[in-house]
Amino acid sequence: MSNRAVPQGYLANLQFRIRSDNLPLLSTVQPSRGHKRGGRAVNYAEFDNELLEDFSNFPTFDIDSDSNDEEQSSASAGNDDPQANANGGEAAGVNGQGSGDGGSANTGAGRHGKSQLTAEMEKNYKTGVPDLNEQKDSLNVLRYQKIRESFQHGKIAVPYRLYVPPELSTGQQEAILIPITLNVEHGNNTISDAFVWNVNDTSISVEDFVTTYCNDLGLYGNVSLHSQIVSSINEQIQELENVASLVIPDLEVVVNLTCTIQGKFFEDYFQWNLSDKSLSPEKFALIIVADLGLAREFAPGIAHSLHEYLLHVKKEWAEGSLHQDTVPNEAAFGYLAGVRLNIDDLGAKWAPKVEYLTQEEIQKREIEKERNMRRLKRESDRMGGGARRGRRRLDDLELTMKM
């Protein structure tokens, strides 16, 4: 047995982990069973029991079109090599679940024409993977099932060479961060992701980022999905770029922050100064995660939710419809108050909390939060729209007098 080991960062199991239930970044939607026009109807009453038993031994394929069935049957009938048949079955299906659209980690070139992965890329990804039994395992870590599965489902990591010119790296402007939310459905796959995009970072374009993003998810060369994600990111950037670049004077708002990850519902209630640049949402999220002992997945989730809330406050402030709850300042001579003592509940409202909730309870909390925000917006419109209503009534009165 050889003592060679896999180099550091040679294999990646990202595509395997994102399809698990704990990381629902790329989920597979089960297609609904329905009659398709043009589908071939099979009358099983014509077969005897023995024929049905023989028929059940053959592998099943998609019956989206007659040509695909004939091509699959002719390929399997003309090739008696079991290894070749196994490779053909892998290229035709996605983990034994039928043909996919390039959204699986084991998707081959595909005889259905749905995957755009070339034969050369497929060969490079299938060759060069070290054997599991030839690894030097001095710590005996391969005996654990999770580690063995991670090694077996690993694929060769593709290094991305990103050249940043010196003038771009040294002359960067102040970061304008925009929270991006992706909820894209393509075929049988649904991408649900959230990240932050810096508008002033010109070292990489949206198109190049989406290309790398699709390659990491195993969606190689999917042109329609690539354009769909690019358009979604560009729309959100155009919508929020002007709001994110606003410079707001000294303004303190009360933030009711919520974040849900892996069935854990995080909620916090605190005061935030929009003009203070010493504390960013990313630093705040890291402090919260460290203090509460949360998983690392909460750090980008909390930062993204805080960015969304602050942009919502900026937009209302620019439109003149900001209605925020303020903390009464009980200090004398207009100075800022220090630590407030609440004898009733000891400030439990201002403490972060984490709850284990079901999916129905999480959706109920989110609906209640959106309902409260709409109620506050209606109240602010009612308070700020009195002059407009009075003018409209005066115009109606003048029109009535003229008539």
UniProtKB/Swiss-Prot annotation:
Gly residues: bias regions: 95-105
GO cellular component, one term: RSC-type complex
A Pfam short name: SNF5
Gene Ontology MF: a single term: nucleosome binding
Acidic residues: bias regions: 63-72
GO biological process: chromatin remodeling at centromere; chromosome segregation; double-strand break repair; G2/M transition of mitotic cell cycle; nucleosome disassembly; regulation of nuclear cell cycle DNA replication; transcription elongation by RNA polymerase II
Main subcellular location of this protein, as a coarse class: nucleus
Keywords linked to the UniProt accession: Cell cycle, Chromatin regulator, Nucleus, Transcription, Transcription regulation
InterPro entries per UniProt: Sfh1/SNF5, SNF5
Source species, domain of life: Eukaryota
Compartments (UniProt record): Nucleus
Residue spans of biased composition, Low complexity class: 84-94
Region (Disordered): 58-115
Family: Belongs to the SNF5 family.
PANTHER family named among the record's database cross-references: SNF5
Free-text function comment from the UniProt entry: Part of the chromatin structure-remodeling complex (RSC) which is involved in transcription regulation and nucleosome positioning. RSC is responsible for the transfer of a histone octamer from a nucleosome core particle to naked DNA. The reaction requires ATP and involves an activated RSC-nucleosome intermediate. Remodeling reaction also involves DNA translocation, DNA twist and conformational change.
Protein name: Chromatin structure-remodeling complex subunit SFH1
